[in-house]
Protein backbone atom coordinates (compact mmCIF):
# COMPACT_ATOMS: atom_id res chain seq x y z
CA UNK A 1 0.00 0.00 0.00
CA UNK A 2 1.38 3.41 -0.96
CA UNK A 3 1.89 5.87 1.87
CA UNK A 4 -0.07 9.10 2.28
CA UNK A 5 2.19 12.08 1.62
CA UNK A 6 1.88 15.05 3.99
CA UNK A 7 3.78 18.36 4.01
CA UNK A 8 4.78 19.88 7.37
CA UNK A 9 6.05 23.47 7.22
CA UNK A 10 8.52 24.85 9.75
CA UNK A 11 9.99 21.34 9.94
CA UNK A 12 12.85 21.18 12.42
CA UNK A 13 11.21 23.66 14.80
CA UNK A 14 9.67 22.65 18.11
CA UNK A 15 6.00 22.88 17.15
CA UNK A 16 6.47 21.10 13.83
CA UNK A 17 8.62 18.39 15.42
CA UNK A 18 5.81 17.55 17.86
CA UNK A 19 3.45 17.05 14.92
CA UNK A 20 6.05 15.03 13.02
CA UNK A 21 6.78 12.69 15.95
CA UNK A 22 3.06 12.07 16.47
CA UNK A 23 2.37 11.30 12.81
CA UNK A 24 5.48 9.09 12.67
CA UNK A 25 3.88 6.76 15.21
CA UNK A 26 1.77 5.49 12.33
CA UNK A 27 3.65 3.97 9.43
CA UNK A 28 1.22 4.88 6.65
CA UNK A 29 2.52 8.45 6.20
CA UNK A 30 5.38 9.81 4.12
CA UNK A 31 6.37 13.22 5.51
CA UNK A 32 7.74 16.12 3.48
CA UNK A 33 9.37 18.95 5.43
CA UNK A 34 9.53 22.63 4.41
CA UNK A 35 11.53 25.36 6.12
CA UNK A 36 13.37 28.56 5.26
CA UNK A 37 16.52 27.41 7.10
CA UNK A 38 18.74 24.66 5.64
CA UNK A 39 20.12 24.06 9.14
CA UNK A 40 16.76 23.64 10.84
CA UNK A 41 15.29 21.45 8.12
CA UNK A 42 18.35 19.19 8.34
CA UNK A 43 17.35 18.05 11.83
CA UNK A 44 13.72 17.33 10.98
CA UNK A 45 12.71 13.66 11.11
CA UNK A 46 11.01 13.68 7.70
CA UNK A 47 11.29 11.49 4.61
CA UNK A 48 12.16 14.35 2.25
CA UNK A 49 12.91 18.02 2.82
CA UNK A 50 12.91 21.30 0.93
CA UNK A 51 14.28 24.75 1.70
CA UNK A 52 11.61 27.29 0.72
CA UNK A 53 11.45 31.11 0.69
CA UNK A 54 9.77 32.96 3.58
CA UNK A 55 6.01 33.37 3.22
CA UNK A 56 6.60 37.11 2.75
CA UNK A 57 8.80 36.52 -0.30
CA UNK A 58 7.38 37.15 -3.80
CA UNK A 59 8.88 33.76 -4.76
CA UNK A 60 7.02 31.79 -2.09
CA UNK A 61 3.87 31.00 -4.05
CA UNK A 62 5.71 29.83 -7.17
CA UNK A 63 8.13 27.64 -5.21
CA UNK A 64 5.45 26.04 -3.05
CA UNK A 65 3.25 25.28 -6.07
CA UNK A 66 6.23 23.83 -7.93
CA UNK A 67 7.09 21.42 -5.11
CA UNK A 68 3.48 20.42 -4.52
CA UNK A 69 2.94 19.72 -8.22
CA UNK A 70 6.02 17.49 -8.21
CA UNK A 71 5.60 15.71 -4.85
CA UNK A 72 1.78 15.46 -4.93
CA UNK A 73 1.05 15.50 -1.18
CA UNK A 74 -2.47 14.78 0.06
CA UNK A 75 -2.31 17.50 2.72
CA UNK A 76 -0.18 20.45 3.82
CA UNK A 77 0.02 21.38 7.51
CA UNK A 78 1.52 24.84 8.18
CA UNK A 79 2.90 25.51 11.66
CA UNK A 80 3.30 29.30 11.75
CA UNK A 81 1.05 32.31 11.22
CA UNK A 82 2.76 33.80 8.12
CA UNK A 83 2.41 30.54 6.20
CA UNK A 84 -1.14 29.97 7.41
CA UNK A 85 -2.04 33.41 6.06
CA UNK A 86 -0.24 33.00 2.73
CA UNK A 87 -1.39 29.44 2.06
CA UNK A 88 -4.95 30.47 2.83
CA UNK A 89 -4.66 33.30 0.30
CA UNK A 90 -3.39 30.99 -2.47
CA UNK A 91 -5.46 27.92 -1.57
CA UNK A 92 -7.17 27.83 -4.97
CA UNK A 93 -3.80 27.42 -6.70
CA UNK A 94 -2.62 24.58 -4.48
CA UNK A 95 -3.13 21.09 -5.85
CA UNK A 96 -3.48 19.62 -2.38
CA UNK A 97 -5.79 19.84 0.62
CA UNK A 98 -5.67 22.48 3.34
CA UNK A 99 -7.64 21.55 6.44
CA UNK A 100 -8.46 25.23 7.02
CA UNK A 101 -11.40 27.40 7.96
CA UNK A 102 -12.58 29.74 5.19
CA UNK A 103 -10.16 32.53 4.32
CA UNK A 104 -12.26 35.27 5.93
CA UNK A 105 -12.09 33.44 9.27
CA UNK A 106 -8.34 32.87 8.91
CA UNK A 107 -7.69 36.55 8.15
CA UNK A 108 -9.87 37.69 11.06
CA UNK A 109 -8.18 35.39 13.58
CA UNK A 110 -4.71 36.52 12.51
CA UNK A 111 -5.55 40.15 13.39
CA UNK A 112 -6.18 40.57 17.12
CA UNK A 113 -7.77 44.02 16.77
CA UNK A 114 -10.20 42.94 14.06
CA UNK A 115 -11.06 39.83 16.05
CA UNK A 116 -11.66 41.96 19.16
CA UNK A 117 -14.14 44.11 17.24
CA UNK A 118 -15.84 41.01 15.83
CA UNK A 119 -16.15 39.60 19.35
CA UNK A 120 -17.71 42.79 20.72
CA UNK A 121 -20.20 42.92 17.84
CA UNK A 122 -21.21 39.31 18.46
CA UNK A 123 -21.55 39.35 22.23
CA UNK A 124 -18.34 37.45 22.97
CA UNK A 125 -16.70 38.60 26.21
CA UNK A 126 -13.17 39.92 25.68
CA UNK A 127 -10.75 42.19 27.52
CA UNK A 128 -11.35 45.93 27.13
CA UNK A 129 -8.95 46.95 24.35
CA UNK A 130 -7.96 50.09 22.45
CA UNK A 131 -6.06 50.52 19.19
CA UNK A 132 -2.95 52.71 19.35
CA UNK A 133 -2.96 54.84 16.20
CA UNK A 134 -0.27 57.27 17.39
CA UNK A 135 1.90 57.77 20.46
CA UNK A 136 -0.41 60.63 21.45
CA UNK A 137 -3.22 58.09 21.92
CA UNK A 138 -1.45 56.27 24.73
CA UNK A 139 -2.02 58.64 27.64
CA UNK A 140 -5.78 59.02 26.94
CA UNK A 141 -6.03 55.24 26.66
CA UNK A 142 -4.44 54.81 30.10
CA UNK A 143 -6.91 57.29 31.58
CA UNK A 144 -9.76 54.92 30.65
CA UNK A 145 -8.48 52.23 33.02
CA UNK A 146 -8.25 51.92 36.78
CA UNK A 147 -5.70 49.11 36.83
CA UNK A 148 -2.15 48.62 38.05
CA UNK A 149 -1.14 46.75 34.91
CA UNK A 150 -2.19 46.91 31.27
CA UNK A 151 -1.25 44.62 28.39
CA UNK A 152 0.49 46.15 25.36
CA UNK A 153 0.91 43.88 22.36
CA UNK A 154 1.21 43.67 18.60
CA UNK A 155 -1.95 43.19 16.56
CA UNK A 156 -0.39 40.38 14.53
CA UNK A 157 2.10 37.65 15.35
CA UNK A 158 2.40 34.53 17.48
CA UNK A 159 4.46 33.59 20.52
CA UNK A 160 3.52 36.81 22.36
CA UNK A 161 5.35 38.87 19.75
CA UNK A 162 5.62 42.49 20.87
CA UNK A 163 3.65 41.80 24.04
CA UNK A 164 4.41 42.90 27.59
CA UNK A 165 2.83 44.21 30.77
CA UNK A 166 3.06 47.98 31.33
CA UNK A 167 2.16 50.03 34.39
CA UNK A 168 2.09 53.55 32.94
CA UNK A 169 1.88 55.42 29.64
CA UNK A 170 5.63 56.11 29.52
CA UNK A 171 6.43 52.41 29.62
CA UNK A 172 3.92 51.76 26.84
CA UNK A 173 5.38 54.57 24.72
CA UNK A 174 8.91 53.27 25.21
CA UNK A 175 7.88 49.72 24.34
CA UNK A 176 6.06 50.67 21.14
CA UNK A 177 8.82 53.10 20.10
CA UNK A 178 11.40 50.35 20.56
CA UNK A 179 9.53 47.97 18.26
CA UNK A 180 8.98 50.80 15.79
CA UNK A 181 12.59 52.00 15.68
CA UNK A 182 14.44 48.69 16.14
CA UNK A 183 12.11 46.12 14.61
CA UNK A 184 10.39 48.12 11.86
CA UNK A 185 6.84 47.80 13.18
CA UNK A 186 4.36 50.66 12.87
CA UNK A 187 2.95 52.55 15.87
CA UNK A 188 -0.50 51.49 14.67
CA UNK A 189 0.51 47.81 14.91
CA UNK A 190 -0.24 47.82 18.66
CA UNK A 191 -3.14 47.67 21.08
CA UNK A 192 -3.41 48.32 24.81
CA UNK A 193 -5.87 46.32 26.88
CA UNK A 194 -6.72 45.45 30.45
CA UNK A 195 -4.47 42.75 31.89
CA UNK A 196 -6.58 39.84 33.06
CA UNK A 197 -5.24 38.12 36.19
CA UNK A 198 -5.87 34.51 37.11
CA UNK A 199 -5.29 31.23 35.32
CA UNK A 200 -4.12 31.09 31.71
CA UNK A 201 -5.74 28.54 29.39
CA UNK A 202 -5.26 27.37 25.82
CA UNK A 203 -8.03 25.55 23.98
CA UNK A 204 -7.66 23.68 20.70
CA UNK A 205 -10.35 22.05 18.61
CA UNK A 206 -10.90 20.21 15.34
CA UNK A 207 -14.07 20.65 13.30
CA UNK A 208 -15.36 19.13 10.07
CA UNK A 209 -18.23 20.62 8.08
CA UNK A 210 -19.74 22.33 11.12
CA UNK A 211 -19.36 19.35 13.46
CA UNK A 212 -17.03 19.37 16.47
CA UNK A 213 -14.70 16.38 16.31
CA UNK A 214 -12.35 17.03 19.23
CA UNK A 215 -11.69 19.77 21.77
CA UNK A 216 -8.99 19.84 24.43
CA UNK A 217 -7.82 22.47 26.88
CA UNK A 218 -4.69 23.00 28.93
CA UNK A 219 -3.71 25.39 31.69
CA UNK A 220 -0.35 27.05 31.12
CA UNK A 221 1.67 26.65 34.32
CA UNK A 222 5.01 28.07 33.18
CA UNK A 223 6.35 29.59 29.98
CA UNK A 224 9.24 28.89 27.62
CA UNK A 225 12.14 31.29 28.30
CA UNK A 226 9.88 33.32 30.60
CA UNK A 227 12.80 34.69 32.62
CA UNK A 228 14.28 36.34 29.51
CA UNK A 229 11.00 37.97 28.43
CA UNK A 230 9.96 41.43 29.70
CA UNK A 231 6.44 40.15 30.35
CA UNK A 232 7.63 36.94 32.07
CA UNK A 233 4.96 35.25 29.95
CA UNK A 234 4.45 33.66 26.55
CA UNK A 235 1.73 31.88 24.61
CA UNK A 236 4.11 28.88 24.47
CA UNK A 237 4.02 26.88 27.72
CA UNK A 238 7.04 25.19 29.22
CA UNK A 239 4.71 23.21 31.46
CA UNK A 240 0.97 22.75 31.06
CA UNK A 241 -1.70 20.43 32.39
CA UNK A 242 -4.76 19.11 30.61
CA UNK A 243 -8.02 20.38 32.06
CA UNK A 244 -11.69 19.52 31.57
CA UNK A 245 -13.82 22.63 32.02
CA UNK A 246 -17.27 22.73 30.45
CA UNK A 247 -17.54 26.51 30.91
CA UNK A 248 -14.33 26.98 28.95
CA UNK A 249 -15.48 24.56 26.26
CA UNK A 250 -18.88 26.23 25.95
CA UNK A 251 -17.25 29.67 25.62
CA UNK A 252 -14.93 28.46 22.83
CA UNK A 253 -17.66 26.58 20.99
CA UNK A 254 -19.89 29.66 21.03
CA UNK A 255 -17.08 31.88 19.69
CA UNK A 256 -16.14 29.43 16.92
CA UNK A 257 -19.73 28.90 15.82
CA UNK A 258 -20.26 32.67 15.60
CA UNK A 259 -16.99 33.09 13.73
CA UNK A 260 -17.85 30.36 11.22
CA UNK A 261 -21.59 31.03 10.98
CA UNK A 262 -22.14 27.45 12.13
CA UNK A 263 -19.90 26.01 9.40
CA UNK A 264 -16.66 25.51 11.33
CA UNK A 265 -14.08 23.47 9.45
CA UNK A 266 -10.44 22.85 10.30
CA UNK A 267 -8.40 23.47 13.42
CA UNK A 268 -9.06 26.37 15.79
CA UNK A 269 -6.64 27.40 18.54
Describe the role of every protein-language-model region.
Residues 262-269:
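A short glycine-rich, hydrophobically flanked beta-strand micro-motif that places a catalytic Asp/Glu
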Residues 106-190, 197, 209-211:
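Active-site nucleotide/adenylate-binding loops and adjacent lid/helix of ATP-dependent enzymes
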Residues 35-38, 81-83, 104, 209-212, ...:
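Short glycine-enriched loops at secondary-structure junctions
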Residues 170, 174, 194-200, 204-260:
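ATP-dependent carboxylate/phosphate-activation module, predominantly the ATP-grasp catalytic core
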Amino acid sequence: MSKIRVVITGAGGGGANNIISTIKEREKYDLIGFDISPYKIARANVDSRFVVPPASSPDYEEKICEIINKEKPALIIPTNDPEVEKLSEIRNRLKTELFFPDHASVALCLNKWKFHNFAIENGIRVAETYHVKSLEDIEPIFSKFNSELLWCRAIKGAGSKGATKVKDSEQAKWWIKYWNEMRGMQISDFTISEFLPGKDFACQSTWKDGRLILMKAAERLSYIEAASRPSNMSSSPELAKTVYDTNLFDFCIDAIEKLSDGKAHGNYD
